[in-house]
Amino acid sequence: AEAYYRFKNNLAVVNVTSGPGGTNAITGVYGAWVDSIGMVVISGQVKWETTVRSTALPLRQYGDQELDIEELVKPITKYTKMITEPKSIRYHLEKAFYIAKSGRPGPVWIDVPADIQNAEINPKKLLTYKPKKIVKKICTLKLMVRSFYVIIQSNVNLGKICFFFG
């Protein structure tokens, strides 16, 4: 995924299994985090009902090869999410791809429990991610910067402000 991003300047998807598959991917994800490399990691997970999180018990592990990978990778990803509702899968995938590419690129991680992977989903009921508010803010900031530049440039041209470069 890192090499693909470096050569194509586009995201690659890494698909890993639960437990050790996720932990083995952490080194590469950390490298992507440090070097600002965008990538999307999708990991498998045991059924939601056999995760520690679903039980709220003070255990380290509940299901076979279960690991709360979300908590492990939060410090080295721009976005991480365990999918708990089948209808939210599209929303979180779209959000992950958007975040991985926006601003300073970086890795994102989506964890998908087995029961969510096997769920029947009505495509018409899938939630979608719409970052309109973020885009609007960026456009507003861009206009503010342009306006500021025009004011500075005008004052420089009038001799009111002197810049020294060197």
What is the predicted function of each stretch?
Residues 1-166:
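N-terminal alpha/beta PP-like core and its mobile active-site loop of ThDP/TPP-dependent enzymes
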